[in-house]
Design a protein with these regions (language model features):
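Conserved NTP phosphate-binding and transfer environment spanning the P-loop NTPase/kinase superfamily
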Residues: 43-74, 88, 93, 251-366
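Extreme N-terminal, non-catalytic leader segments
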Residues: 58-138
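Conserved nucleotide-sensing/catalytic segment adjacent to the nucleotide-binding pocket
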Residues: 93, 98, 170-172, 177-227
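Glycine-rich phosphate-binding loop used to anchor ATP phosphates in small-molecule kinases
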Residues: 129, 133, 202-270, 327-342
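P-loop (Walker A) phosphate-binding loop of NTP-binding proteins
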Residues: 144
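Conserved lysine of the Walker
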Residues: 149
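Hydrophobic positions on the alpha1 helix immediately C-terminal to the Walker A/P-loop
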Residues: 152, 156
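Post-Walker A helix-loop "phosphate-sensing" segment adjacent to the P-loop in P-loop NTPases
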Residues: 158-170
Length: 366
């Protein structure tokens, strides 16, 4: 699915990521602008690993591109360049060589995680004296708008479905859990579409919990990026797959604060088995966003019924100025306050360079 929506999927109130003085910081004692998820340089009382008395305080193993691509060199890569072109997102220049370098090791790693998860389930069943089929293994893919997370999700789903032990793979995006435009208008939230309060977070949580619990048939709403709204009476049906790939900006958000003291709160991330955060410099993401917007202006935005048709009918420079304003006032704010702080919750972080090529991988230590 090609995303033409200018906003992001979010699942956690912005106030959860602010200090009492409203300056941004997900860490209570950190200066504004410091992300807890920055595994390379976190400004805090313990920013120097020597303060902990250990040589390396990072929860991640860091590998550069060459180190990562050398792993799993014998693993199969059942894709062609034509397959890659069908799967990649608009504006993402990924080719077969990049897939070979990045996704061959990644799918081999995922296959190992899945096998380990199934073995653990088998041992637990033996301990309890019960026999239950394994529940779906859930892989989450998060990251900014325009960073390429949709391409990552599609490639992972396509590759994992080629393995004999996991032939049934479903891909669901969180776009379908946006509230309908009618509801947003009633609540005065159309201008904040894409912010946490514009999502049906309960429905999303119930969907993921049902899938992970092994429900035989679960449905998710369908969102149209052309009309910029939920499609009435249409659903995606998930029927107990081997793997569910869940893609969206909100999938790693922690649970919001409970309204009752001592109340237990669950988040989508509580049901995820393996999570991937696609990372890049915000300036690069902005450029990719504007490039994609201009391409859509001359393609998808021209379609009859397109919510964005007004952009197709104005000069490019005027349209790009509007797109840049959306980036600065909406997407960049969401990235800094809601998305980037979840990076440190991911199992694996894929960092891209300015040319959309993977430059670094961070893998959480077991």
């Amino acid at each position: 699915m090609i995303s033409v929506c200018s906003q992001c999927d979010l699942d956690s109130p912005p106030e959860l990521h602010r200090r009492p003085d409203e300056s941004h910081s997900p860490l209570g004692d950190c200066p504004p602008g410091t992300f807890i998820c920055d595994t390379v340089s976190v400004t805090s009382e313990l920013s120097d690993p020597s303060d902990l008395g250990i040589p390396d305080a990072s929860p991640y193993i860091e590998l550069d591109r060459d180190q990562w691509s050398a792993l799993a060199s014998s693993a199969p890569l059942p894709l062609t360049q034509a397959d890659v072109e069908k799967l990649r997102g608009l504006g993402d220049p990924i080719d077969l060589a990049e897939v070979d370098a990045v996704y061959r090791p990644l799918t081999a790693l995922l296959e190992d995680y899945i096998a380990t998860s199934r073995e653990r389930a088998h041992r637990t069943g033996a301990f309890l004296g019960v026999s239950e089929p394994p529940t779906p293994f859930i892989v989450a893919v998060a990251g900014s708008v325009a960073v390429g997370k949709s391409t990552t999700a599609r490639l992972i789903a396509h590759l994992l479905a080629r393995f004999p032990d996991t032939p049934r793979v479903d891909l669901v995006t969180t776009d379908g859990f946006l509230l309908p435009n009618r509801v947003l208008e009633e609540r005065g939230l159309m201008a904040r579409k894409g912010f946490p309060e514009s999502y049906d977070r309960r429905a999303l949580l119930e969907f993921v919990a049902a899938v992970k619990s092994g429900s035989k048939r679960v449905q998710a709403p369908v969102y149209s990026h052309t009309v910029y709204d939920i499609v009435p009476d249409r659903h995606v049906t998930v029927e107990r797959p081997d793997i569910l790939v869940l893609e969206g900006l909100n999938v790693l958000q922690p649970a919001p604060r409970g309204s009752r003291p001592g109340a237990s709160a669950l988040a989508v991330s509580d049901f995820i088995d393996f999570s991937i955060y696609v990372d890049a410099d915000p300036d690069d993401i902005r450029r990719w966003y504007l490039d994609r917007f201009l391409t859509l202006k001359h393609t998808a935005f021209t379609q009859p019924g397109s919510y964005f048709r007004r952009f197709a009918e104005i000069p490019d420079d005027v349209a790009l100025a509007g797109a840049n304003e959306i980036w600065e006032s909406v997407n960049l704010v969401n990235l800094r306050e809601n998305i980037a702080p979840t990076r440190g919750r991911a199992t694996l972080v894929l960092t891209k360079d300015a040319e959309h090529r993977m430059s670094r991988v961070l893998l959480r230590k077991s």
